[in-house]
């Protein structure tokens, strides 16, 4: 049996973690392209 609190924490952290990884990857991609317009 899984505790509701633990389940809620996991369901809350997983999307945030995936979003953080996506944002960090997008920042590295945008930085490597070095577009002056985004500065």
Curated annotation (Swiss-Prot):
Name of encoding gene: petG
This protein's UniProt keywords: Electron transport, Membrane, Photosynthesis, Thylakoid, Transmembrane, Transmembrane helix, Transport
Pfam families: PetG
One cellular component term from this protein's GO annotations in UniProt: plasma membrane-derived thylakoid membrane
Thylakoid found in the keyword field: yes
Assembly description: The 4 large subunits of the cytochrome b6-f complex are cytochrome b6, subunit IV (17 kDa polypeptide, PetD), cytochrome f and the Rieske protein, while the 4 small subunits are PetG, PetL, PetM and PetN. The complex functions as a dimer.
HAMAP family: Cytb6_f_PetG
Annotated membrane topology: Single-pass membrane protein
Name of the protein in question: Cytochrome b6-f complex subunit 5
Transmembrane regions: 5-25
InterPro entries: Cyt_6/f_cplx_su5, Cyt_6/f_cplx_su5_sf
Location within or outside the cell: Cellular thylakoid membrane
Function in brief: Component of the cytochrome b6-f complex, which mediates electron transfer between photosystem II (PSII) and photosystem I (PSI), cyclic electron flow around PSI, and state transitions. PetG is required for either the stability or assembly of the cytochrome b6-f complex.
GO molecular function: electron transporter, transferring electrons within cytochrome b6/f complex of photosystem II activity
Family: Belongs to the PetG family.
GO BP term (any one): cytochrome complex assembly
């Amino acid at each position: 049996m899984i505790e509701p609190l633990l389940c809620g924490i996991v369901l809350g952290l997983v999307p945030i973690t995936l979003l953080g990884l996506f944002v960090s990857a997008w920042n590295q991609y945008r930085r490597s392209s070095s577009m002056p317009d985004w500065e």
